[in-house]
Amino acid sequence: MFGLFIITAIAEILGCYFPYLILKEGKSAWLWLPTALSLAVFVWLLTLHPAASGRIYAAYGGIYIFTALMWLRFVDQVALTRWDILGGVIVLCGAGLIILQPQGLIR
């Protein structure tokens, strides 16, 4: 399930990054096409998660933050601060609790 969260986050980040390139960096308007595709894939991927939507969105939020921090480090090439790392660890712990809770507690 963790891999599905990561792929979902990458699709969403790409869907936001392409408009950033168009509007902020002056890149080609043709990037609206992969923007639409990325966001459509993102929405489709959300439907593949096997739990109630609210629980998925809550857990996904933590994985999204982790993925965004990896994007910051490796795509934007900005060094993470100790606050970035600590915040990432905290939200991953929270997402992990939601994702890995005992199945008997889930309705």
Curated annotation (Swiss-Prot):
Membrane-topology annotation of the record: Multi-pass membrane protein
The protein's superkingdom reads: Bacteria
List the protein's name: UPF0060 membrane protein A1S_1909
Which PANTHER family does the UniProt record give? UPF0060 MEMBRANE PROTEIN YNFA
Q: Which residues cross the membrane?
A: 2-22, 28-48, 56-76, 85-105
Keyword Cell inner membrane among record annotations: yes
Q: What is its main location?
A: membrane
Which family does the record claim for this protein?
Belongs to the UPF0060 family.
* The entry's keywords: Cell inner membrane, Cell membrane, Membrane, Transmembrane, Transmembrane helix
Its Gene Ontology cellular component terms are:
plasma membrane
Q: Which InterPro entries match?
A: UPF0060 (IPR003844)
Q: Where is this chain's protein located in or outside the cell?
A: Cell inner membrane
The keyword Cell membrane belongs to this UniProt entry's keyword annotation: yes
